[in-house]
Amino acid sequence: MTVTGPRTRPHARPATGPGTGPGPGEAVAKPRFRAEVEGLRAVAVLAVALDHAAVPGFGGGFVGVDVFFVISGFLITGLLVHEAETRGRISIGGFYARRVRRILPLSAFVLVLTVLASYAVGGSAIGNRVAADGAWASVFLANVHFAQSGVDYFNRGGFVSPLEHYWSLGVEEQFYVLWPLLILAIGLVAASSARTRRRLTVAVLVVLVVASLAWSVTQTASSPTAAYFSPFTRAWELGIGALLAVALSRGRRHAPGGGR
């Protein structure tokens, strides 16, 4: 499935149809390494690790996860916009295939290894609990599972699932499923004008960010556990990254780096 991209680059051969890619001799610029993005990602990882290790002074290190969501929104939106502007279309199927190839093998390997280790170390009682968590994590719904189970992310007492960190991967994958479809819908609604598409994309993102942030504030006060794991209360972070990608995309010859 494809959608016509927002514009043709100056001096490039005009596209002849909705699914037309670059013409002969028109190389498509590839994503480049972004040292600043990788550096920010490293800082976020370190903050989360120090928080989990209970290092004094890093009790708020969990905000590294928020930074990750902003980075994800920035990179994925940047790749989609870049593909549209350089190829004249967005391949939804290709996007999903790349996500599967990049995420599924390692994710599945860690899941299987963790479940087996849980049975080996903790016996059937622990193994069964971790296996149940793994079943949800395998379909990228760990965040929904932990929210429904009433898991308190900030309460480290009692049993803590070794797969609890899969909740953030669930939020990201849910975003990856829906966001390209929304971009596709915007492209179909405003198929004739690149400027209209860009403005509509920004408008949709602003509404998404404001609504999600308001819902996050409300839910955090009334249901903090659900608010922590919910994709609806996290959408504003991904949306901010997406807004940055759209704002910085004009005139860029390379897609955002980061190996997405």
Annotated model-derived regions:
Residues 2-17, 21-260:
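Membrane-interface helix/loop caps of multi-pass membrane proteins
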